[in-house]
């Protein structure tokens, strides 16, 4: 069988499905959520430097950290694992924010108790808000511009914060965010440069969330699910 025939046959089988995809799209349900990505920083470089065994241990430590923190809060769903990162979702930003704060504080503790000079244990986090289509796939998945924007926001590298929030999420949940202002400040809006958005035709504006870690430990409100 000639290669050209094989290619033509495979292409026809794909094109034949497109009409079915158009029809099935209208049946997909919309889900409006707060979204969060938590990423293990420099995981690939750490594996290259330290080898696969230590890289595996660090990766499993990260995923255990995520799962142990979110298990106390039934409002947070682990949608999927993406390499050395996770996509989380909730109806409100509050449970995601509290999970991320706890994850960050524990990461800071691990960084101090298990010192690593070149690639210390660190996480990077981002939030967004918006509608996404729930896809019909073997594993649960979603498709939407709010998740696309969040993925781009995760490219931000800052010396002041490792937590960013999409402007839409900030606007929608601003009053909730203010409840944590005894240890948390929010930057002025910033815009992602085209080079950081993979030429996305939509502007992305975000803010940095800066945590005062000493004042966090004096905070006696909220975090209800972990105080039980």
Describe the residue ranges of each PLM region.
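Detector for Asparagine
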Residues: 4, 42-45, 68, 73-74, ...
């Amino acid at each position: 069988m000639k290669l050209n025939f094989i290619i033509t046959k495979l292409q026809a089988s794909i094109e034949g499905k497109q009409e079915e995809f158009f029809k099935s799209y209208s049946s997909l349900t919309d889900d409006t959520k707060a979204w969060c990505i938590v990423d293990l920083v420099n995981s690939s470089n750490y594996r290259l430097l330290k080898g696969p065994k230590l890289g595996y241990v660090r990766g499993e430590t990260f995923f255990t950290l995520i799962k142990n923190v979110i298990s106390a809060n039934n409002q947070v769903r682990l949608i999927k694992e993406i390499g050395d990162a996770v996509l989380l979702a909730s109806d409100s930003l509050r449970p995601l924010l509290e999970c991320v704060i706890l994850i960050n504080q524990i990461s800071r503790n691990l960084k101090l108790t298990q010192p690593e000079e070149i690639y210390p244990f660190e996480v990077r986090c981002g939030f967004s808000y918006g509608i996404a289509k729930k896809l019909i796939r073997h594993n649960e998945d979603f498709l939407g511009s709010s998740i696309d924007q969040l993925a781009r926001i995760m490219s931000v590298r800052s010396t002041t914060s490792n937590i960013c929030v999409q402007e839409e999420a900030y606007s929608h949940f601003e009053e909730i965010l203010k409840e944590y202002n005894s240890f948390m400040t929010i930057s002025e809006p910033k815009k992602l440069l085209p080079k950081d958005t993979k030429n996305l035709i939509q502007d992305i504006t975000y803010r940095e969330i800066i945590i005062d870690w000493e004042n966090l430990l004096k905070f006696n409100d909220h975090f209800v699910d972990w105080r039980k």
